[in-house]
Amino acid sequence: GLPVFFIPLVLNSVLFISLFEVKGFAKNVFGSLAALLAVDSVLDPAAVSLGIWNYSGGFFYGVPLSNFAGWILSGTVSILVLKSALDTGRLSERLENTDYFLDDMVSFVFLWGVVNLYYMNIIPVIVAVLFGAALYRNDRFNLAISELDMV
């Protein structure tokens, strides 16, 4: 099950970095990997807190360094394969023209950010808020509170 969920996280990280028009293949890969590690720094502490993941000790809210090393290795390979397989020009155009293209990342940030907040995992909460702010700044949060009918 986990490899199936890994692919959308990698894709979302690549798309997220595309919002910032990072120039250069190496910078784009590095930025995508940094985004993926940041996503993992939100996901794994929450999963450990909920008992979904269980490690025998870990320095970051119960998550061991070896987990992040695994993400670096598998993430680098996955990002390179994905960037080689996709037409990044068309992907960037699609991202620009499709408001909901990163909606699952918005949901991810909200869900896992709230779980981390509940368990007082402060650093993951800050990372989730930063993701949320970046997504909001790039018009990826389509929450029209002013249009809601409040009774």
Can you annotate each of these PLM segments?
Residues 1-151:
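Aromatic-rich, lipid-facing transmembrane alpha helices and their immediate juxtamembrane interface loops
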